[in-house]
Amino acid sequence: MLHRTTIATPVGDLRVVASDAGIREIRMPLPDRSIPMPAAENPDHPILKNAHDQLDEYFRGERRAFDLPLDVEGTDFQLAVWGALVDIPYGATESYGELAQRVGRPGAARAVGGANGRNPVPIVVPCHRVIGASGAMVGYSGPSEGGIAIKRWLIRHESGGTTA
């Protein structure tokens, strides 16, 4: 059974879905993410309560990494990229090309970008820390300008530029 809750954050309401094994999805507050969620509202589920607490700590500037159980599905390549994302230090950024190099696929920056864009648990798996080779903010939770604004906010937050 899937459970969900909505968590108010400085970047908008995050909708979080969990199975009994872990977090399956975090939806960003963007218009193109308004698809109904096949899960029962259950903010008291232990995994969702833990997610709420850890996300609150993150947005208050008190947490730099998450230790939530995850229950995500993806290809082997996607899972490798998502696993490498958590190794990007808090407050740091890395280019898609650098990330491709680290997952053993030099020259696969576009494929890394595709995997990054399919990350089902943004913030917890920090895909916002990946930027273009030129330093440009490109793509975040979809192509909309709203996603780029959230990415910019998260990077600024982690560099000490803003807190909740």
Residue locations for each model-derived region?
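…primarily DNA-binding HTH/wHTH and HhH modules…
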Residues: A133-A164
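Basic nucleic-acid-binding alpha-helical/helix-turn surface characteristic of O6-alkylguanine DNA
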Residues: M1-G107, H157-A164
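Regulatory, non-catalytic segments
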Residues: A108-P122
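Short Lys/Arg-enriched helix C-cap and helix-to-coil transition segments
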Residues: I123-V130
